[in-house]
Amino acid sequence: MQIIKRNGTTESYDREKIAVAIRKSFISTQKEITDEAVYTIVDEVEQFLHQNEANRSVERIQDEVERSLMEHGFYAEAKNYILYRWQRTERRKVLSQIITGTGDDTIANILKEIQKDFSGKEYSLTFLAEKFTSFCKPDMTSGERLAALVKAAVELTTQETPDWEFIAARLLNFRLTKKLTEQAEAAGIFSFYDKLRYLTDEGLYGNYILASYTPQEIETAAGFMCPERDKLFNYSGLDLLAKRYLIRTRSHEPIESVQEMYLGIALHLAMPEKQNRLQWVKKFYDILSRLEVTMATPTLANARKPYHQLSSCFIDTVPDSLEGIYRSLDNFAMVSKFGGGMGMYFGKVRAAGGNIRGFKGVAGGVIRWMKLVNDTAVAVDQLDMRQGAVAVYLDVWHKDLPEFLQLRTNNGDDRMKAHDIFPAVCYPDLFWRMAKRDLNQQWHLFCPNEIMTVKGYCLEDYYGEEWEQKYMDCVNDSRLSKRSMSIKDIVRLILRSAVETGTPFTFNRDTVNRANPNAHRGIIYCSNLCTEIAQNMSSIETVSTEICTEDGDTVVVKTIRPGDFVVCNLASLSLGHLPLEDEKQMKEKVATVVRALDNVIELNFYPIPFAQITNHRYRSIGLGVSGYHHALAVRGIRWESEEHLSFMDKVFERINYAAIAASSELAKEKGAYHYFEGSDWQTGAYFIKRGYNSPEWKALAVKVSTQGMRNAYLLAIAPTSSTSIIAGTTAGTDPVMKRFFLEEKKGAMLPRVAPALSDKTYWIYKSAYLTDQTWSIRAAGIRQLHIDQAQSLNLYITNEFTLRQVLNLYLLAWECGVKTVYYVRSKSLEVEECESCAS
């Protein structure tokens, strides 16, 4: 039996649909009805249909259900059934209104899905239709009308109705898919392999993908794609992906879907696999497309492309020579050209007034060179997309420190300013101990070149007690010129700059080097742009320069010792989307991402050869996290609580264990990193220093000593400011800035909503500026035990903070064993709604 639908089409009769509708009318009156009574009414409706072949329509069936309900005395239920029919009619009207407004019938299915998945009254499409109608103008194109519909959903997003942002994402994805379909038809693309061939021919895809996989493998991999996962995105995340990460044609039209992007990245990352390669493609694709793991911006943006620079972080040790300084500038320019961020250590460069080749008082100091770094950052602007980014590090005992601390402040001599770079200071324990004990004590600043000339050693090459002995040796040596200041004056300069500019960043060098698992191969002078990397460093040196003849031409050949030019490849576990309590699943996911990051080392396009050499020697990776506050909120755990500290202590210990185990298994399969012998991993000192003495940890230590480690460094927590937006989660390990706010971008107001915001999580999401920062620092100290590198820790202060209070935060961070502090983010105290009920 065929039933005529409202649009004139027919479908096979299904008696269960009638039964479901009858039961719904009883549920609404909170009465029960037996199956016998339900099917009695269904039988009566069927009898009518058999007797009235010309009236077998949906409307007549519903009329008969109403009549039958009333005949059996179910008047209240019949009334509710009538109301149900009316509501369904209204929903159809709204649907029709939106479809007519967009002029696109194909949007109907998306709208019906939205009605089904967001059934609450606050997400009625009536609100969308009203807002959309107000945006529409008679002369709009179809594309402009779709854009207006998306905008309408975005503007309906509030902290009371946060899911409008997911509805907006569905509509945006429909618009994107429509464009992609048009592009594919125009280009004659009918399969994923066709698309990769087209993109490769256009120079938008690296030819290495098609060279590595057969057409059959490509199409098998295409079957891994799950378009349903597009629904995981909120508007902010999908919009950011579409604008900055999806491949576009040379006319800036999108040519790649979100799932195609993730599969393309997975295909690239799995290329080095010798066995079960497609299985690894699927594993990499799954963790990325489920938003459980985010790769760092360079990997997300550049994997699968011709210039596949996949690394985020680079660190250079600037030597004290003209040739060396300009080489470092050139290194920075090349790194910036390909989208990397840079850290530069200037602690070896002689101070202003130092000697050059025996001429006294002629050195210009580090500020002049930093101004060149500043200009390079501005000049090399990544194809006019954004200027370069660099943090410059200087030791707290360097003679140029006072001027350095005023690089970005608004007062003083503008010729001594560099507003586009980020200063950072390296502190020994002694400085903080003296600052805590008595701010009126004297601190002495030196020229590193003078120390080397007079004493025969570099002070910066030592740490801990050995450094303190040599520092006091310098203080007591009358042959060395000193610039003496009270610690109070230095601290005042540091704190004023921090409050005014957010910088300098903090690098606690003794804490870092004591925990260095590869101290047998060098020292760590500083961190990177975002303060999460801590790896061995050394200067690049020219060994010799020769004039030779090659093929009849005269050539100049330089022999260069590459030093340790730090490079790190990053990814983050999205804690808010992961089953943190499920140890088995977490081990598997951590092992998968560790493998992916290790493959990046083989696949990377290196902007300079020194980075490639260091990366292959150490094979360092930086696995971090995002969604930290998100994970706490969905579990009902308050930031300012011992439960927070206890929970995350266990989480990070498990992550560390899983990462070490995964790296060791990779070493068994592919070989250990070059400098494993003699490392804390090999000797077991790594585990002893951290008190990992349970049977499980002891067994792992034995396995590591026997099998080796694939990676010299493993964990580092980056800020994840962009990738956390894509994943729809909170940034790094930061608390949320606000539960909900509007951000203006290119004339549009974009909603930013705390993830999983609801009545249950509302009070858990306390603003970063209202949070007691001592809890954040204590949590960072607890995490630090389980992180072999460092973490991007931001401090949030209001204008009510005194300089003494800010100093106390720095001191607490040092006492808690925190290796680095990133920004001090200050803000005028805003009028907030009453939060006294939060407790």
Question: Regions from the language model: what does each represent?
Answer:
Residues 9, 31, 36-263, 279-285:
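Core nucleic-acid recognition elements
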Residues 9-13, 33-36, 101-102, 140, ...:
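Alpha-helix capping and helix-loop boundary segments enriched in small/acidic/polar residues
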Residues 14-32, 107-121, 263-270, 733-736:
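Short, surface-exposed, low-complexity cationic segments
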Residues 80-87, 164-196, 427, 512-535, ...:
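Terminal amphipathic helices with adjacent charged low-complexity linkers/tails
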Residues 214-220, 230-239, 531-535, 597, ...:
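Catalytic alpha/beta core of large soluble enzyme barrels
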Residues 247, 253, 261, 265-277, ...:
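Function-dense linear segments that define catalytic or interfacial modules
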Residues 287, 329, 589-612, 638-720, ...:
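Internal maturation/activation junctions in enzymes
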Residues 406, 419-494, 498-501:
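Polar, glycine-rich mid-to-C-terminal structural blocks
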